[in-house]
Amino acid sequence: RHTRSAFVTGVQTCAFPISPVRELARWLHRRGVPAYVLPTGALPRPARYVPHIYTDQELAALFAQTDRCRYCSLVPLRHLVMPVLFRTIYACGLRASEARLLRADDVDITAGVLQIRDAKGGKDRQVPVSAPLRVRLADYHAHVVGRSGGDWFFPGRARQPLTLGNVDKNFRRFLWQARIPHGGRGHGPRVHDLRHAFAVNNLRSWFARGENIGALLPVLQTYMGHSSIADTAYYLRLTAESYPHISAQVHRVIGDVVPPITAGPCHGH
């Protein structure tokens, strides 16, 4: 088992630089320099990552551990930042970079709206927040943003925004403390899966209430900043595979339009 896991990781590690290496070999070959051009398909494709949809119990355990984050003299605001950061990512379905790069002026506490700037595809959007999160953001703003003395809503070191590495490192620690197993590099669960869980849990709630899913999909698309409705429809299939008891309802909405999660390219969304 250990050998197989190591092999899969090795394939994924090697697959990424193959394209530039192949182009370099072609460039050398055109200039008369003997070079072996690695044929397409020489390496197996990396295993497709299947998003981890956190259960309600896992989310509760994860957020409980963020609340227990301790003071650190090197990053004196960490214990205040982390509980709100990860709740904001989940409750608003944000990408990690969208959250960590929020500036203080991007958060309108009075209106309860986040201004997401230069997101995936270079797009901006406004994200309304729920009433409970708005209260939490207001308290956080009063106790943290004014004290940080910087431009960032979630400040890191030296008045700079949090790095993705810092976010991931803290997230892995909270997962371990919450007893949520992690499969190692490339196998998750990941921070981005909080965004997936947001979409799936909203769809699950809409199905339970008998809402018109076809009418609400464009709303979810806009809220999450998807460039295509197909990216949003992907979550219908993910919802069905995560909660088989509503798969018949999902199938009536999408039929066979959206491919199974275990096939096709990996969706970052």
Feature names for model-found ranges:
Residues 1-14:
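Single conserved hydrophobic/aromatic residue that forms the stacking wall/gate
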Residues 33-68, 117-120, 156-160:
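Flexible interdomain linker/hinge and immediately adjacent N-terminus
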Residues 53, 118, 224-255:
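Catalytic-site neighborhood detector that most strongly recognizes the C-terminal catalytic loop/helix
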Residues 64-96, 120-123, 148:
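Basic, Lys/Arg- and aromatic-enriched nucleic-acid-binding interface segment
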Residues 71-75, 127, 169-222:
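Short, basic (Lys/Arg/His-rich) helix/loop patches that form interaction surfaces
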Residues 92, 97, 101-139, 143:
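Conserved tyrosine-mediated DNA breakage-rejoining catalytic core shared by Y-recombinases
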Residues 121-138, 151-173, 186-190:
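C-terminal catalytic core of Y-nucleophile DNA break-rejoin enzymes
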Residues 250-269:
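C-terminal secondary-structure termini that scaffold catalytic or DNA-interacting sites
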